[in-house]
């Protein structure tokens, strides 16, 4: 969820997403996206000429109820629900369906997880509740940091974070998470950096610096 971080006024932002999604679908790759709080609030998203998946399904999952997408050739079931409104206070995951038998079950959810006071109380739930669903992997969105909330013996519960740090407070590598699944539905995942700009902290000794211009000179020499 949250394809865009807030509202966007340049139509090229949305068209860029449409173009890249079309490339995936054109290559036979299924795309499943849930609307997060920013997507739900952004009226422009619903007006985009979005491509359909190879099987004819929409790339956005339903806002009305939890939806399951079955990728039969891959043995994968994807469960998720989009935000209907920006401020979603209900525990959406509580109504997600039981895992599909004999398939690798992925839950996708836009949430801050219960108890998170920094990123907003969106679709609150706990890692224990997600674990009890019996899915094989949880892909979470909303928080811009990569985090793993896996409980011992349970499935990975992973925030991939955002693809690109937006400012100095979002430091370190940013990217996506690639999940590999074997024939027994055991999975392993790794972080794949995709950012093009990083914001490293920089310490400058200003004791002998007399003006702002000198700060810039010292910074550029580092």
Language-model features: locations:
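C-terminal functional module detector
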Residues: 168-222
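His/Asp/Glu-rich metal-coordinating catalytic cores
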Residues: 7-188
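Short, conserved active-site loops that position catalytic residues or coordinate cofactors/metal ions
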Residues: 1-2
């Amino acid at each position: 969820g949250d394809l865009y971080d807030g509202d966007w006024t340049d139509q090229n932002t949305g068209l860029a997403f449409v173009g890249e999604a079309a490339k995936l679908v054109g290559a036979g790759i299924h795309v499943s996206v849930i609307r997060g709080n920013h997507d739900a609030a952004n009226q422009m998203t619903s007006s985009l000429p979005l491509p359909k998946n190879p099987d004819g399904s929409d790339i956005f999952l339903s806002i009305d109820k939890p939806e399951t997408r079955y990728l039969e050739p891959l043995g994968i079931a994807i469960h998720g629900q989009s935000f209907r409104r920006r401020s979603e206070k209900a525990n959406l995951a509580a109504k997600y369906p039981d895992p599909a038998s004999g398939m690798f079950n992925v839950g996708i959810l836009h949430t801050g997880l219960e108890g998170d006071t920094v990123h907003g109380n969106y679709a609150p739930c706990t890692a224990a509740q997600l674990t009890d669903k019996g899915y094989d992997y949880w892909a979470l969105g909303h928080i811009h940091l990569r985090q793993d909330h896996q409980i011992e013996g349970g499935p990975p519960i992973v925030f991939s974070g955002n693809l690109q740090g937006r400012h100095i407070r979002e430091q370190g590598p940013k990217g996506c998470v690639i999940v590999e699944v074997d024939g027994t539905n055991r999975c392993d995942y790794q972080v794949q950096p995709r950012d093009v700009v990083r914001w490293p902290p920089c310490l400058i000794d200003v004791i002998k610096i007399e003006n702002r211009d000198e700060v810039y000179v010292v910074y550029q020499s580092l």
